[in-house]
Amino acid sequence: MLVVLLTAALLVLSSAHGSDEEVIYEDSSSQLLDVEQQNQKHGQHHQKPPPASDENGDGDDSDDGDDDGSGDDGNRPERPPPHGGNHQRPPPGHHHGPPPSGGPQTSSQPGNPQGPPPQGGPQGPPQPGNPQGPPPQGGPQQRPPQPGKPQGPPPQGGPQGPPQPGNPQGPPPQGGHQQRPPQPRKPQDPAQDATHEQPSYLWFSS
C-alpha cells in the first residue's frame, strides 16, 4: 500500500513538474522508504508490549490484531509523511523552476540593449563620413576657380595690349591709303599741265 501511494504521488508530481524534479523525487522517495521502514520497526516494538499486558486468551487475537493493526497503524502514520514530503518537495522544485525561467528573461533583457548599440554604431559612422564628403567637394570648387580666374584675365589683358599698338598701326596705313590716292591725282594734274603744254608745242610747231 505504501509503495502504491508513493508511486501515485510520484506520478502526480512528475506530471506537474519536469524530469529533473523526478530525479529529486526518486531520491527523496528512497529516503522516505527508509524512514517508513524505521517507523514500522518502531511501531512493532511499541505494539508488542500491549499484548503482554492483555489477557493470555486474547494474546493470540491481539497478536493477530497487532499484525493487522500494525499494518493499519503503519499505513496511517506513513501516509502523512509522504504527503508532507510531497508538500515539501514542490517548494524546492518551484524554486528550481522559476530561476531557469527568470534566466532567459534576464538574458533577453541584456540582449535588447545589445541590439541597439550596433544600430547606433552604423548611424555614427555616416555622420563623420558626411563632413568628410563636403570638404573635398568644396576644396576642388574653391581652388580651381581662384587660380583660373587670375590666370584668365592676364592673357586677356595681353592680347588687349597688342591691339592697342596695333590700332595706331592700322590707322597709319589707312591714312597712307587715303594719302596715296591723292598722289595719283597729282600726276593727273601734270597731265592737265601737259594739256596746257600742248599749246606750247603747238607754239613750237607753229
From Swiss-Prot:
| UniProt feature, compositional bias: Acidic residues | 55-71
Q: Where in the cell does this protein reside?
A: Secreted
Q: Where is this region: 6 X 18 AA approximate tandem repeats?
A: 80-189
Keyword list, A-Z: Repeat, Secreted, Signal
Whether Endoplasmic reticulum counts among this entry's keywords is: no
Task: List compositional bias (Low complexity) regions by residue number.
Answer: 103-112
Superkingdom field: Eukaryota
Q: Which GO terms describe its cellular component?
A: extracellular region
Entry keyword Transferase:
no
Q: Name one Pfam family in it.
A: Pro-rich
* Ranges of the sequence repeats in the UniProt entry: 80-97, 98-115, 116-133, 134-152, 153-170, 171-189
Positions of the UniProt region annotated as Disordered: 15-206
- From which residue to which does the signal peptide run? 1-13
The annotated regions of Pro residues compositional bias extend over 113-174
Task: Quote the function comment for this protein.
Answer: May protect teeth by binding to tannins.
What protein name applies here?
Answer: Acidic proline-rich protein PRP33
Q: Which gene encodes it?
A: Prpg1
